[in-house]
Amino acid sequence: MLEINIHQQLGSLNLTVNLHIAAKGVTAILGRSGAGKSSLINLIAGLTTAQRGYIKLGEQTLYDHEQGINLAPEKRHIGYVFQEHRLFPHYSVAKNLKYGCKRVDNAHFLQIVKLLGIEHLLNRYPSSLSGGEKQRVAIGRALLTKPQILLMDEPLSALDLPRKQELITYLSQLANQVDIPILYVTHSLDEIIRLADQLILLEQGKIIAFDLVVNVWHSDILADWQSETQKISLLELPLNIQQPIYKMVGLKLGKQHIWIPATPHYKIGDKLRITIASKDVSISLDQVQHSSIRNILNGVITQIVEHNDRVDIAVLIETHQIWASISLWSFDELALKIGQQIYVQIKSVSL
């Protein structure tokens, strides 16, 4: 577990953080520029020093103002991945990976290299690598030091979209397989959805939210970060049924299911996180009997939000909320009201 209780004055920013982070999983840190995100992980890494408070990682005290403890960065057993890859241009990939390791554990080396898909890059030099490949090497180098925690400061921010998609797949696999906590600074809600278990929302140096991603997502506190043109529903559901003939799998939603294309990465019992755009959800008063849409679910209207060009409808299905966006015309014609039983038709689901 990571325990942080610190205070630091950074110009006009008063950074005050008090939290406990679990010993495993990805905790995303979200906030606007200047909110204190990078400052917080730099304090944890020992690159800067708080004016008071303490930082503990497991049984080890990294910093304690009252006790006069302030371990040097290299003694904190922390892996740090920066926005820039910071590889040595005159070293091969293999040498870059091993840099900083007192003794190289060959089995661990091969495990990390395979996990990040960089076996074929070992004899190459940074100048011949893509941005995504460079960041994978930088992540590998951090992991090979066998850190007790991994800090990542916007590792995808310098990459173009194809490279981001490439690297986020590796990061997702990494998050599931490494047995250490990961602190992940980002501006991207998409990265949070794909990678994070918990979310810290920082605003002007203060924590205004810290909870499971799904819980923060559905709270009003994240509204300013989301699209003004539609709502995005975020659900985390167990995979509990397969339809092998049509290569589909069903995610359990109470007594109902959401069907998605089968993927080899998941098995029965695994929890999958999905998003549903409100523009991809329509509403009917009766269950449609013959439709090409597979996901038709029964629910109750719990909230109605009218806009100039549309109406957003929140529908409670079992214990999960899904948003639909419909036209003003449709809203008037259907005469929808809170508490009404209706059916939603979901045209598209994203993993």
From Swiss-Prot:
This is Molybdenum import ATP-binding protein ModC. It comes from Haemophilus ducreyi (strain 35000HP / ATCC 700724). The complex is composed of two ATP-binding proteins (ModC), two transmembrane proteins (ModB) and a solute-binding protein (ModA). It is an enzyme of class 7 (translocase). It is found in: Cell inner membrane. Residues 1-229 form the ABC transporter domain. Belongs to the ABC transporter superfamily. Molybdate importer (TC 3.A.1.8) family. It is a peripheral membrane protein.
